[in-house]
Amino acid sequence: IRKTGVHVLVTGKWDNFVTVSCNDSTLIDEIAKLPFVHSTERVWKGITQRAFQRDSLINKPVRTDSLYGPAITQAAMSRVDLLHDAGFKGQGMTIAVIDAGFHNVDKIDAMKNIHILGVRDFVNPEADIYAESSHGMSVLSCMAMNQPHVMIGTAPEASYWLLRSEDEYSENLVEQDYWAAAIEFADSVGVDLVNTSLGYYSFDDPAKNYRYRDLNGHYALMSREAAKAADKGMVVVCSAGNSGAGSWKKITPPGDAENIITVGAVNKRGELAPFSSVGNTADGRVKPDVVAVGLNSDVMGTDGNLRRANGTSFSSPIMCGMIACLWQA
């Protein structure tokens, strides 16, 4: 394929695909004629990439009487504090966070003792993953924070891989290719659990939008790859989505995958958050599988101070960290 003159971006062994880029569409016609190529599909149209500007730091988070800081309620609702009291805090477990960027994780004082094994950017390998979106940073904080009386996450002694697959400036199928490459990479480095607070159903090209009947665990590439990761022994934890109050309402791939854990959101009283996406899958499986705090979740902000945020993006890592501690036990 490279000999045709295209640039290979990522490959996927589990689903047997290659993602390429080129400026000459006739090269795709040449690739389509190769005897080992089953089909081709356009998954992305190039746009000018914009660079994130680093947010300024304050690095003065408020200390509290509680060991967990303000995160005590979201920890206690999942009972992870009981696991911690028993000595199970995620030590020896490896978690991959597949997300958007991890803004300022390398600069925030309260995050400097997180055990990060490595980073990989599948969207733009030359980019600084710590200067991209803040979404993955806040997701990571729900699990990995380990600052007594500031914030303790649900798996503070686990080790983490930070993997970027989401391009915040567009919604294209290529992001699922990046995600597939990321989860296969996670498998290759021995990851135990994957948290992904991502999901897709609507794209820049409306012809690519998913329909409810597509939520069968097999239609979307991400869902197939997530199921294969589970088959290989990884625990895949995924946000249900935030469309519960909108017209779509349903979970989003890869949340429809078989044998993964899809997490909805509740408030700190245990009441379902109105935005939390619902099931079932198109083939009748109950989703989401579990819920955790996702309304007014306590997370780290890009300035190094704590903030509150809404979304199943945060209930998912809260649950993922608890599962890591339970597995350790």
Task: Label the model's feature ranges.
Residues 163-167, 250, 294-329:
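Hydrolase catalytic cores
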Residues 216-233:
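Catalytic-core regions built around general acid/base machinery
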Residues 160, 165, 184-216, 239:
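Short acidic, glycine-rich surface-loop motifs adjacent to enzyme active sites
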Residues 126-137, 217-218, 307-319:
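Gly/Ser-rich catalytic serine loop of serine hydrolases
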Residues 2-75, 80-84, 258:
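Autoinhibitory propeptides
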Residues 15-17, 24-27, 46-48, 100-104, ...:
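Solvent-exposed loop/turn segments at secondary-structure junctions
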Residues 82-120, 125-175, 189-192, 205, ...:
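Subtilisin-like serine protease catalytic core
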Residues 176-179, 203-211, 238-260, 264-287, ...:
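Active-site-adjacent substrate-recognition loops and nearby beta-strands
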